[in-house]
């Protein structure tokens, strides 16, 4: 029975992703459909249209298996050896700078939100 529940929850999450993709194609938005789907899920959770319990196990499962979703893209990088050898150092530098920026912005925003709630003194 657990697999049926898990499958249903994952299907519900994919429905949000597919709906986001459909909206992005219909409205010709420059935003990826998956982001629109996440936003739709956020709104649905915020207004209790979808209960957290309805997706919790499915989301936890997908997060646990997240590394499997990166394997195809990691393997695809091998196809571009020439590009990597030509721009490898530049790409590493860009990745390091962007990771640093994301980490800093996330940390600053988290601190601001916690101070706003009064959690941090």
From Swiss-Prot:
Organism: Bacillus cytotoxicus (strain DSM 22905 / CIP 110041 / 391-98 / NVH 391-98)
PANTHER family: HOLIN-LIKE PROTEIN CIDA, HOLIN-LIKE PROTEIN CIDA-RELATED
Keyword hit for Ligase: no
GO cellular component: plasma membrane
Role: Increases the activity of extracellular murein hydrolases possibly by mediating their export via hole formation. Inhibited by the antiholin-like proteins LrgAB. In an unstressed cell, the LrgAB products probably inhibit the function of the CidA protein. When a cell is stressed by the addition of antibiotics or by other factors in the environment, CidA possibly oligomerizes within the bacterial cell membrane, creating lesions that disrupt the proton motive force, which in turn results in loss of cell viability.
Family: Belongs to the CidA/LrgA family. CidA subfamily.
Alphabetized UniProt keyword annotations: Cell membrane, Cytolysis, Membrane, Transmembrane, Transmembrane helix
Disulfide bonds: none
InterPro entries cross-referenced by the UniProt entry: Holin-like_CidA (IPR023760), LrgA/CidA (IPR005538)
Cross-referenced NCBIfam families: PRK01658.1
Swiss-Prot/TrEMBL GO biological process terms: cytolysis; killing of cells of another organism; programmed cell death
Transmembrane segments annotated in the record for this chain: 27-47, 58-78, 89-109
Membrane topology type: Multi-pass membrane protein
Name of the protein in its database record: Holin-like protein CidA
Domain of life: Bacteria
